[in-house]
């Protein structure tokens, strides 16, 4: 279903990271390209802990760090590890400014960052506050990420309800 969706002419590539997140939850193991793509996209999106986890999963599954890609995989893993450590040290400092912001974007992003750090309750609470605050450029994308957060937290009923409520056109 996820790969069929990406072949539609209306597919928007900005959802690629979300698709990889869903694949990661649904499948036992991704292929090396998907792990590295997920890590790269997560770094670009500002979620280094998610990137670190993707690389760690790939290495644990035994599909990363081999052959001609061993060097690039190690470099990406090192970059993700460094940025994740920095993010863990500095994440709390962003909370006050996200709360004061006119729109909920900062709260949604900060909340998802906490979710990637397995601080599900705190992260989901911030995401819900951000969505309720409004002013989001892409509300359905924020709701999609909240649904993913619910699923990662094991809140199946909330995840299903959130997924069912999505009405995006992309």
Give residue ranges: language-model regions.
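Alpha-helical repeat scaffolds
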Residues: 1-2, 12-25, 50-59, 88-96, ...
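Solenoid-like repeat scaffolds
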Residues: 8, 21-30, 43-45, 59-65, ...
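Generic helix N-cap/helix-start motif at coil->alpha-helix transitions
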Residues: 1-2, 12-16, 29-37, 47-50, ...
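Residue at a conserved register position within TPR or TPR-like alpha-solenoid repeats
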Residues: 5-6, 42, 114, 150
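Eukaryotic tandem repeat interaction scaffolds
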Residues: 81-106
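C-terminal soluble interaction/assembly domains
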Residues: 102-170
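Long, contiguous interaction/recruitment modules in multidomain scaffold/adaptor proteins
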Residues: 40, 44-87
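Helix-turn-helix repeat elements of alpha-solenoid scaffolds
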Residues: 7-17, 78-88, 115-124
